[in-house]
């Protein structure tokens, strides 16, 4: 049995307040407790999973939607919309080397902000050896200026504390 250390007579006498007992035996409540203040990542090709995921998470939880190789950035839009409609916060991965051109990026940002209510994006280089368009890395995407004028309120950047196999340490 679980005992709350804050509910001991000594703590009660000293004015310490007790804490709530964990949600034992309720998977949805346990999952919500574990991710409180956290985030989750889901595949962009599974918009139908958004409602099931939302049933396990607190409303407004950030859900990062990946941008996989061989897929267009616009292919992530149905999942971003489904995440927003499920009451969660959609956060797209934007992989610079996978973007064909400025028009593709501009169309995506306009629709992501307008249709899915995207406020934040994670800017990545992408693991391709060669860029398919003008953006060699996340920094080039940021310098381009469309992110700043898109309506996004925040961007996230990856960190590689142990290094990255395709990025020289000096660049990191």
Where are these regions (language model features)?
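Intrinsically disordered, low-complexity segments enriched in small polar residues
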Residues: 7-8, 15
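Ala/Thr-enriched low-complexity intrinsically disordered regions
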Residues: 12-13, 23
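Compositionally biased non-globular segments, especially hydrophobic aliphatic-rich helices
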Residues: 15-16, 26
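Active-site beta->alpha loop and helix N-cap motifs at the rims of alpha/beta catalytic domains
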Residues: 27-172
